[in-house]
Structures are given as structure tokens and as C-alpha cells.
């Protein structure tokens, strides 16, 4: 490859935010494509046709002069639930999509149109098999993301669910076996990548998920945050606890609800220790299958009047909640790499999170927040009491969190690291005479 020519990268994914709606993988791919294009990289985007109304963000990507779009239909099955959410779909339609999308990447590689393939999850299954059968030597980078198909971690692990996901596991492992480099999004995730994908640690490279600080800052509207409080009946003096995420069981929102109930009323039934504990509200941003159960739970626990469920919001409204929050809590039972936590830190919010997935790589206890054992109501309640009682310290913690993001988790930093990984793989292939 000519060192002076731009890199030509195929990005293969089942979804991205601007085309298919929000989600952790979707948002990551969206940011990745935008920052690759901004770096001068030529991108071949292989994914599903757009399912959203065309907007300025979508047009900016699809109409970019350095991007070619290769839509691959996602053939799901009537009556089997929403696309990409049921176990049956994930283990049939998704690998089939990955076979077809990967074959498109293989054709582009064989035609000399791309230098490297960067796949997400099982979306490069077809390319992985082609490399093995046809000796295609265009390098493959694989990001397996959260690896929920392997059953998760800790309390959310389900042996039965893992068994049901066996076909998808095999597809992702085939992609990993063919990859030149497997990405772990955090140092803490490396052992899980090695174990789940049955690979060697030497083949794993840490490239963190990142946030776009310019976007966060552009949405940092103090006035809109005040309006959010006013609209939802939250006074400026109330301590606002924020959580953001899909309302799934593995996010641990039920654990947080029970912990807040303990904060609201001491275990002995006596008056809470701190008067501030009487003056808090919990805002939950997101939607999902556990919404009704959570509404019922907070009412049963006696904190329904303190809790606001916003549903899905626009990016501007989500960032407004970050800006006006006093504390961000992410009680997840399993996590790959939490973009919501990074966004909260980018907005200078102190964080309480659980010791799972990549969260310990982000939240420094006593510096930018607190870490607790997943699923422990008592431990979480104790830390919340501690946080509410240290309002002056929270601002210092929030600023420390912002510094951590600027140093390690901003796209300006991460894209340079990723481009270096690409170039190293291409140089290695050229040295071996493979491309």
C-alpha cells in the first residue's frame, strides 16, 4: 500500500445509530464512521438499509464523498418478535446477515477496492469464512462488543440463554478465529474476550469506546436542563439522580430502585440520617421491556412520587438531563463498555457504577465516583447516602471524570490509536508479502 494514499476501510455492521436508531453498538459505529471520514479515510459502509426518516445526520454520512454505501437486507421471520431482539432472530437472521454482508466485503477485497475490513460482531461471518477458504489476505479487525450472546457476567449469566445462543456464539468465534486483531473495549474486558472467543491474549488489542466531546459540549445547555427540571416538577434545590439506558433486567434498575427505597426510609423505620435524603429525585431515561415492571416496583416501594420515567429522548434532551443532574448512577449487572457512563463523565457528573465489564477502567473510586458490587442493594444504598452527604465534593469528582474522558476516552484520542492499529496490520501484511 502507498503510504501517501488514504486508507480504504470496509466497516461491516448490523446497525448504526443515524440509520437504525440508538444503541451502544449503533452509536459507536456512527461515531467511528464519522471520525474515519474526518481523518481522510475512505469508507465502504456495509450494513442494513436505513429504517429511519432521512435527516441531516444521516445525509451527512451517506452523501460524504469518501463513503460508499452497500446496503444488505436483514431478512427476519414474521411472528418471531422485533428484529435483533429475540434469541431466535439473533441465532438465525443475524448470522445469515453476517454471511451475506461479509461476502460483500470479500468481493470488495478481491477487487482491490479496500485495504482492511473492520467488522462488528457476527456481521463479518461471510468474510471470515472466505479468508479461510480463498486465502484472502486483506486484514480483518473484529470488535465483538458486549458479547451478550455468551451469557454475560455475574448475576445476569444464564446457562440456558448461553446454550440457546450457541449458533451466534459459533459465528462470532469463527470471525475471531479469522481476525488479525480482536478489539477489547477496556483492559478489564480482555480476559472475557479471550475466554468467550477462545483466543490468545496476544491477538487482543485494547481500543476503548469513546465519546465525542465536541458533541457533548454543544448539547451542554444549562438552560435546557433547567427547563427539564421545571417541566417534570423538579425544583432547582432537589438532588437529582440520573440513570440512562435500556430498561432491561441486566441493567439493574430494580436494584437501584430498592437501594433508593432504603435511602428514603432507613431499615429500622426511623427518620433518615440526613435531611438531604428527603430532597432527591430519580430520573430514568430510556425505554425497554422492563418499563411496566419498574413503574410498578417504584410505586410498591413508595418512591413512585420521586421517580420520573422519561422514555426515549432526543440527543439534546438526554444531554440536558446530564447537564442538570447531581449524580449519575449506572447499576448494571452486566456491561461491555458503557457509553452512557462516559457521557455523564464528559458532562462532569460524578458516577456510581458497578464493578462489571469495562466500568472499573473508567470510574476511579474516590476520584471520579464510587464502584459497588453488582446486585447489592445494601452496598448501593450506603454509597448513595455517602454521595448525597458530600455535595461539595461531587463537583471535584465530576471535574476529575471529565479529565479522565479527555485523556483516555475521547474520539480525538481513540481514532488516532485505531488508525495506528490499522497501519500496523497493513505493514505487517506487506512485510509478509501477503497483500
Region spans (language model):
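Short hydrophobic beta-strand element within catalytic cores of glycosyltransferases
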Residues: 350-353, 363
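A short helix/loop element that forms part of the nucleotide-sugar donor recognition site in Leloir-type
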Residues: 57-58, 217-234, 269
Amino acid at each position: 500500500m502507498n503510504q501517501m494514499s488514504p486508507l480504504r476501510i470496509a466497516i461491516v455492521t448490523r446497525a448504526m445509530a443515524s440509520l437504525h436508531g440508538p444503541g451502544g453498538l449503533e452509536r459507536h459505529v456512527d461515531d467511528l464512521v464519522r471520525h474515519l471520514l474526518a481523518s481522510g479515510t475512505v469508507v465502504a459502509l456495509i450494513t442494513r438499509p436505513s429504517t429511519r426518516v432521512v435527516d441531516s445526520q444521516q445525509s451527512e454520512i451517506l452523501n460524504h464523498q469518501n463513503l460508499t454505501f452497500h446496503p444488505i437486507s436483514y431478512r427476519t421471520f414474521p411472528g418471531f418478535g422485533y428484529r435483533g431482539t429475540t434469541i431466535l432472530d439473533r441465532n438465525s437472521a443475524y448470522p445469515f446477515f453476517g454471511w451475506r454482508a461479509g461476502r460483500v466485503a470479500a468481493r470488495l477485497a478481491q477487487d482491490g477496492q479496500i485495504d482492511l475490513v473492520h467488522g462488528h460482531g457476527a456481521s463479518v461471518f461471510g468474510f471470515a469464512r472466505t479468508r479461510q477458504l480463498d486465502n484472502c489476505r486483506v486484514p480483518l479487525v473484529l470488535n465483538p462488543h458486549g458479547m451478550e450472546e455468551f451469557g454475560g457476567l455475574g448475576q445476569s449469566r444464564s446457562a440456558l440463554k448461553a446454550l440457546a445462543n450457541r449458533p451466534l456464539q459459533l459465528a462470532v468465534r469463527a470471525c475471531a478465529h479469522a481476525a488479525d486483531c480482536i478489539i477489547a473495549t477496556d483492559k478489564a474486558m480482555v480476559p472475557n474476550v479471550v475466554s468467550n472467543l477462545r483466543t490468545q491474549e496476544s491477538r487482543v488489542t485494547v481500543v476503548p469506546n469513546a465519546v465525542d466531546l465536541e458533541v457533548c459540549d454543544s448539547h451542554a445547555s444549562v438552560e435546557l436542563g433547567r427547563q427539564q427540571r421545571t417541566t417534570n416538577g423538579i425544583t432547582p434545590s432537589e438532588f437529582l439522580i440520573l440513570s440512562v439506558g435500556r430498561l432491561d433486567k441486566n441493567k439493574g434498575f430494580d436494584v437501584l430502585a430498592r437501594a433508593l427505597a432504603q435511602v428514603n426510609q432507613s431499615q429500622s423505620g426511623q427518620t433518615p440520617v440526613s435531611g438531604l435524603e428527603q430532597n432527591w429525585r430519580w430520573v430514568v431515561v430510556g425505554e425497554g421491556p422492563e418499563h411496566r415492571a419498574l413503574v410498578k416496583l417504584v410505586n410498591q416501594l413508595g418512591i413512585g412520587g420521586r421517580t420520573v420515567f422519561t422514555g426515549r429522548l432526543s440527543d439534546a434532551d438526554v444531554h440536558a438531563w446530564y447537564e442538570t443532574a447531581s449524580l449519575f448512577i449506572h447499576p448494571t449487572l452486566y456491561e461491555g463498555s458503557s457509553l452512557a457512563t462516559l457521557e455523564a463523565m464528559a458532562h462532569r457528573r460524578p458516577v456510581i457504577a458497578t464493578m462489571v465489564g469495562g466500568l472499573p477502567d473508567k470510574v476511579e473510586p474516590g476520584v471520579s465516583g464510587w464502584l459497588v458490587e453488582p446486585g447489592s442493594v445494601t452496598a448501593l444504598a450506603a454509597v448513595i447516602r455517602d454521595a448525597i452527604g458530600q455535595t461539595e465534593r461531587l463537583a471535584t469528582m465530576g471535574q476529575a471524570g471529565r479529565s479522565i474522558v479527555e485523556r483516555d476516552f475521547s474520539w480525538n484520542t481513540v481514532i488516532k490509536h485505531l488508525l495506528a492499529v490499522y497501519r500496523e496490520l497493513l505493514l505487517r501484511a506487506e512485510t509478509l508479502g501477503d497483500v
